[in-house]
Amino acid sequence: MMARLALHPAEQRRLAEDPSVIPRAVEEMLRWETPVTSVVRVTTQDTELSGCPIAADEVVSVILGSANTDERAWVEAESVDIDRRVNKHLAFGGGVHRCLGSHLARMELRVVLEEWHARIPEYRVPEGVELDVSPSLRQIADLPLVW
């Protein structure tokens, strides 16, 4: 989330100038930068998905990041809109398997963005630095910033 904002100064300014946008921005960036990109499940019954039969007791990988950018579910799915009003993303899973810590994580993200942007409204990744993002768990090992 901080890496994305460091690369998008207009969004940084929005959050610094209008902190009321932060809760929506958190949800949108969770949709876009889904922290856990996939989960493994076992089917409980025979089913079919998009014409593909899946037998009971099959192991399937659910790609949450893909679901969160599905154009059938999202208007302008391939763009980030921190003003997006309806945002029922799957960044924390869903149903009985939903992350128990999702409410705490959201609160932590809101507080971090509020406090950071109140103190450091402008920041960026230094020129020439390439960010190394882990593909399975959306994380960056090192995020150098200048402000």
Question: How should these model regions be labeled?
Answer:
Residues 1-147:
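Cytochrome P450
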